[in-house]
């Protein structure tokens, strides 16, 4: 047993230190990034925010809307092949360039993913997603799918430490998904005692990935546009959002009437709700590691997207970054004990 004495930080522990800027308006800030991926040398250009591969967030409808903002969607793995075929046949190939095909690590997942990718050459992204990216089985699956799909960009996770980021990149991942336990409907830290404060995880994992020519996704922990900006400021190349995009028209979640007001069900993918729906219940050898909540129905997601992107643009103007790429170079975080004045409630 050993104890690491270094203090690790989450988004609530810091604020940006403002800096002099020559920018006159938020409209001068570009949030578009261009990446060349390590294993394929293919390029992608867009706004590096990704809708999470949760079945109440990462839907086909969400993908269509976010693509209009040049954002990405990791479409959840529970759509059938027939549903994928319909989506692909009805969708502009340019839009498919903003879609990730999500998969688990079973043999059935592997076979299904290859069948989906064969539907269109425009499907270039694979999201290999497990809760625990530290298992040898996961690394072996990553090598297998890299060998089978040499021309596809692979996102793999989740991990929270630099050495495992390096392992995944060297095993075939172009992008590594970072985050264990920070999500709004994740209870892993409570059920297992395992986790890592998200901002420190991003800072440390970004350093490891960039040294090998890879990228990272900060996955989880963002509750407001300022948190998204902090993730980018900490070095994340992409930021993945679940709860911030939940309960919208495009989500496909179950709508529940509560005292005449519409609410939408939102749950973690390791929750009993998810396992009841997709796995026939919680297996006797495991515990649920997610919660189920009802969120007020929020209408079309485009208004929320504009709020998030507007907040990040504003961050850039405060620190003098004319492009999102410059934000991490212009970032100085200050440690704080308070974030906002809540005398009249939270934003």
From Swiss-Prot:
Task: Supply the InterPro entries for this chain.
Answer: Aldolase_TIM, GMP_reductase, GMPR, IMP_DH/GMP_Rdtase_CS, IMP_DH_GMPRt
Q: Which Pfam families match?
A: IMPDH
Q: Where does NADP(+) bind?
A: 108-131, 216-239
Q: Which UniProt keywords apply?
A: Metal-binding, NADP, Oxidoreductase, Potassium
Gene Ontology molecular-function annotations: GMP reductase activity; metal ion binding
Which Gene Ontology BP annotations are present? purine nucleotide metabolic process
Q: Which reaction does it catalyse?
A: IMP + NH4(+) + NADP(+) = GMP + NADPH + 2 H(+)
SMART domains found in the cross-reference section: IMPDH
Q: Where is the active site?
A: 186
Instruction: Quote the EC number.
Output: 1.7.1.7
Q: Which SUPFAM superfamilies match?
A: Inosine monophosphate dehydrogenase (IMPDH)
**Residues annotated as binding K(+):** 181, 183
List the GO terms this entry assigns under cellular component, sorted alphabetically: cytosol; GMP reductase complex
Highest rank taxon of the organism: Bacteria
- Identify the PANTHER family for this entry: GMP REDUCTASE
Q: What does the UniProt function comment say about this protein?
A: Catalyzes the irreversible NADPH-dependent deamination of GMP to IMP. It functions in the conversion of nucleobase, nucleoside and nucleotide derivatives of G to A nucleotides, and in maintaining the intracellular balance of A and G nucleotides.
UniProt subunit comment: Homotetramer.
Q: Which family does it belong to?
A: Belongs to the IMPDH/GMPR family. GuaC type 1 subfamily.
According to UniProt, the name of this protein is: GMP reductase
Which species is this record about? Answer: Aeromonas hydrophila subsp. hydrophila (strain ATCC 7966 / DSM 30187 / BCRC 13018 / CCUG 14551 / JCM 1027 / KCTC 2358 / NCIMB 9240 / NCTC 8049)
Write the gene name. guaC
